[in-house]
Amino acid sequence: MNKRMVYLGIDPGKKGGLAVIKDLNEEREVRTYPYSDDTLKKICKELTADWKNVILCVVEKVGAMPKQGVTSTFNFGKGYGYILGVLEANCIPYQLISPQRWKKHFSLDNDKNKSIQTAKRLFPSVSLLPTDRCRVESDGMAESLLMAEFARRLSGGTI
């Protein structure tokens, strides 16, 4: 039986990320992106055109953040709703997973550098740089990649 699945991880927010893991029988294609609304729409359109019912997405379940202003909270909630709306509109199944759950699976805490190191260990050939000109790796891209891997393991029954 051929195994063809796509796993999408989304770390919402201004410095968030998107990651796609495509299992193509014996090969695997992995891509990461800094988060943007346009990138999300483009990826979802591409995936639904080619993959239909073989997509699983994990979106980090977020709540209000202490000491965040009213406007910031509203804008973040609006962006979060946008992500869920795009997924729903494209009929992409998703699960909201708390950061504690997926981070516990990878033995991580709130240290963003540990997320980057774990992503680099699991996917050494994948760039976590938002652009070619950046020198600092993106923790949002690293965490979205770990969420996509969490989705892959969840789908495979290893969690």
Where are these regions (language model features)?
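Phosphate- and other anionic-substrate recognition elements at nucleic-acid/protein interfaces
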Residues: 1-159
